[in-house]
Curated annotation (Swiss-Prot):
Organism: Nitrosomonas eutropha (strain DSM 101675 / C91 / Nm57)
Keywords: Aminoacyl-tRNA synthetase, ATP-binding, Cytoplasm, Ligase, Nucleotide-binding, Protein biosynthesis
Organism placement in taxonomy: Bacteria, Pseudomonadati, Pseudomonadota, Betaproteobacteria, Nitrosomonadales
InterPro entries associated with the record: aa-tRNA-synth_II (IPR006195), aa-tRNA-synth_II/BPL/LPL (IPR045864), Anticodon-bd (IPR004154), Anticodon-bd_dom_sf (IPR036621), His-tRNA-ligase (IPR015807), HisRS-like_core (IPR041715), HisRS/HisZ (IPR004516), HisRS_anticodon (IPR033656)
GO terms of molecular function: ATP binding; histidine-tRNA ligase activity
Originating gene: hisS
Cellular component terms (Gene Ontology): cytoplasm
Protein name: Histidine--tRNA ligase
GO BP, sorted A to Z: histidyl-tRNA aminoacylation
Subcellular location: Cytoplasm
Length: 421
């Protein structure tokens, strides 16, 4: 017997029991985003590699080490499985001239791919929901993105998620700060870990996000970006804080908050939990006013966020909400006899027409065995059909969950009967 083929490491199957929770999340997301006027945009999983090099940044970890890239053997194109969704969204907006009709509120969802070391909350194929507001310049849209996240946590029943915010200022102010940060860190070069040394000349702000406990003391003494912020960025950040306070949104200012993607400026934020260990960020985003021009479009402001679905579902699975999410049939149709077997199809389809979830027993078996399967299915009712019932166009309804007397009624009345129990 040949060896069984398994899924690629870090790329997981979503089994039926898990899919119930995914379905609940996806339904909630669609309703939530519609309430804020966001529309769905769907982009290809594969993009030109240069899209991510230009948008994410050539010296980021994602581009240097984590992308799944390959050469198309047919035409020699350098292609990449998308590692994130914002760049693809912006590319589509530019390509199809969507901003010509005004600012856009858009969202996407689907799988992303990064070649990372798999661990809890971090996979090589993972899923994100991303929300993008393109063409909006003020702090009010930054606040909208944050406020809508707070609503989502309530809808999903997720407690104990805290908001951290900061500002990265303008490109000019970051360049000034970058020079000061490098000068400071060079004094501790021998004490820096391998990642920090590599990033020192290429992406020094990412060092601030180090999870290495041995770097903590060095980073605590590092200069603050706030000391170099331009006046417009400070005004923007102050206005954002006022809106959040007025709307009752609690937050912490985290001076070390940076994003792993080069395109961010001004507002950045993360929603964080302590329940997922090192992978505690469940949603992150901010403003990226230069990205549209960077990819080849007419300059326009933009901001957005992305959330990791697997991490959020891990939190939901520990709540009371998860216990109530389980897809089971309303009715399990049991039948005995050749005439009954034929009539059972009509019964099942009639109930489905009325909106009931119905499982029609397949595979034969005794009445006792079928009833056992009906009970195990989780269905509330069994619709029992023998040749006698089939001959008269009737169905026996038995409650599987309550002490209710079994009744025999005409098929034409079954749906109304079940709706009123």
């Amino acid at each position: 017997m040949p060896e069984a083929i398994r899924a690629v490491r870090g790329m997981n199957d979503i089994l039926p029991d898990e899919s119930d929770l995914w379905g609940f999340f996806e339904d909630t997301i669609r309703t939530w985003l519609a309430a804020y006027g966001y529309r769905n945009l769907r982009t290809p999983i594969v993009e030109q590699t240069d899209l991510f090099v230009r948008s994410i940044g050539e010296v980021t970890d994602i581009v240097e080490k984590e992308m799944y890239s390959f050469i198309d053997q047919l035409n020699g194109e350098n292609l990449t499985l998308r590692p994130e969704g914002t760049a693809s969204c912006v590319r589509a907006v530019i390509e199809h001239n969507l901003l010509y009709s005004g600012p856009q509120r858009l969202y996407y969802s689907g799988p992303m791919f990064r070649h990372e070391r798999p661990q809890k909350g971090r996979y090589r194929q993972f899923h994100q929901v991303g929300v993008e507001a393109l063409g909006f310049v003020g702090p009010d849209i930054d606040a909208e993105l944050i406020i809508m996240c707070a609503r989502l946590w309530r809808l999903l029943g997720i407690p104990d998620v805290r908001l951290e915010i900061s500002t990265l200022g303008s490109i000019e102010s970051r360049l000034i700060y970058r020079a000061r940060l490098i000068s400071y860190l060079e004094k501790f070069y021998d004490e820096l870990d391998e990642d920090a040394r590599r990033r020192l000349k290429t992406n020094p702000l990412r060092i601030l996000d180090s999870k290495n406990p041995g770097m903590r003391e060095i980073l605590e003494g590092a200069p603050h970006l706030f000391d170099d912020l331009d006046e417009d960025s400070l005004i923007h950040f102050d206005a954002l804080q006022r809106i959040l306070r007025n709307q009752g949104i609690s937050f912490e200012i985290n001076h070390r908050l940076v994003r792993g993607l080069d395109y961010y400026n001004r507002t950045v934020f993360e929603w964080v939990t302590d329940k997922l260990g090192a992978q505690g960020t469940i949603c992150a985003g901010g403003r990226y006013d230069g990205l549209i021009a960077q990819i080849g479009g007419k300059p326009a402001p933009a901001c957005g966020f992305a959330m990791g679905i697997e991490r959020i579902l891990s939190l939901i699975s520990e709540t009371d909400v998860a216990a109530e999410i389980h897809t089971v049939p309303d009715v399990y149709v049991v039948h005995q006899g050749d005439i009954a077997a034929g009539f059972s199809w009509k019964v099942a389809e009639s109930l489905r027409d009325a909106g009931f979830k119905v499982v029609l027993h397949s595979g034969g078996g005794s009445f006792k065995a079928q009833m056992k399967k009906a009970d195990a299915s989780g269905a509330r009712f069994a619709a029992i059909i023998g040749d006698d019932e089939a001959a008269t166009g009737q169905v026996s309804i038995k409650s599987l969950r309550e002490a209710v007397e079994q009744v025999k009624i005409d098929l034409t009345k079954v749906a109304v009967f079940l709706e009123n129990i």
